[in-house]
């Protein structure tokens, strides 16, 4: 089981993620209703304004909370959290895999040019 501090941070990050997903839903609604407004449907203007307002409120709240989490992380590196030393062990494998996938895609799109 994680220490309480880590559990709190994970819960907070989960809440931020939920808010960001909700914000994306609002953005989707804004886009849809904007299309309706462009078609001349003026009756949806109050909904458009409401969704835009909700989008910006959620954006503000989630960025504020994320900034707080980043600040807490900065303050606790070296005290509650150990500094992490990352060593790359699989150098070049990501490039090889990408090239392999691009070759497969090329073969699918144009079989005459396959290697």
Swiss-Prot record:
Misc note: Present with 396 molecules/cell in log phase SD medium.
Domain of life (superkingdom): Eukaryota
GO biological process terms on file: negative regulation of transcription by RNA polymerase II; positive regulation of transcription by RNA polymerase II; positive regulation of transcription elongation by RNA polymerase II; positive regulation of transcription initiation by RNA polymerase II; RNA polymerase II preinitiation complex assembly
Main location: nucleus
Gene name of this polypeptide: MED11
GO molecular function, one term: transcription coactivator activity
Localization per Swiss-Prot or TrEMBL: Nucleus
Annotated effect of mutating residue 31 to A: Impairs interaction with RAD3, reducing the interaction of TFIIH with the head module and consequently resulting in a reduction of RNA polymerase II CTD 'Ser-5' phosphorylation
Residue ranges the record marks as coiled coil: 56-107
Protein family per UniProt: Belongs to the mediator complex subunit 11 family.
Keyword vocabulary terms for this entry: Activator, Coiled coil, Nucleus, Transcription, Transcription regulation
Function summary: Component of the Mediator complex, a coactivator involved in the regulated transcription of nearly all RNA polymerase II-dependent genes. Mediator functions as a bridge to convey information from gene-specific regulatory proteins to the basal RNA polymerase II transcription machinery. The Mediator complex, having a compact conformation in its free form, is recruited to promoters by direct interactions with regulatory proteins and serves for the assembly of a functional pre-initiation complex (PIC) with RNA polymerase II and the general transcription factors.
Pfam families documented for this protein: Med11 (PF10280)
Organism, as annotated: Saccharomyces cerevisiae (strain ATCC 204508 / S288c) (Baker's yeast)
Assembly behavior: Component of the Mediator complex, which is composed of at least 21 subunits that form three structurally distinct submodules. The Mediator head module contains MED6, MED8, MED11, SRB4/MED17, SRB5/MED18, ROX3/MED19, SRB2/MED20 and SRB6/MED22, the middle module contains MED1, MED4, NUT1/MED5, MED7, CSE2/MED9, NUT2/MED10, SRB7/MED21 and SOH1/MED31, and the tail module contains MED2, PGD1/MED3, RGR1/MED14, GAL11/MED15 and SIN4/MED16. The head and the middle modules interact directly with RNA polymerase II, whereas the elongated tail module interacts with gene-specific regulatory proteins.
Name of the protein in its database record: Mediator of RNA polymerase II transcription subunit 11
GO cellular component, one term: mediator complex
């Amino acid at each position: 089981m994680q220490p309480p501090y880590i559990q709190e941070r994970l819960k907070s990050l989960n809440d931020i993620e939920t808010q960001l997903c909700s914000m994306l839903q609002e953005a989707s609604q804004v886009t849809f209703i904007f299309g309706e407004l462009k078609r001349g449907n003026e009756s949806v203007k109050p909904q458009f304004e409401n969704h835009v307002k909700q989008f910006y409120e959620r954006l503000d709240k989630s960025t504020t909370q994320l900034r707080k989490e980043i600040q807490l992380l900065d303050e606790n590196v070296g005290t509650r959290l150990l500094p992490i030393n990352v060593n790359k062990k699989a150098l070049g494998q990501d490039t090889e895999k990408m090239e392999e996938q691009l070759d497969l895609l090329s073969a699918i799109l144009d079989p005459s040019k396959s290697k």
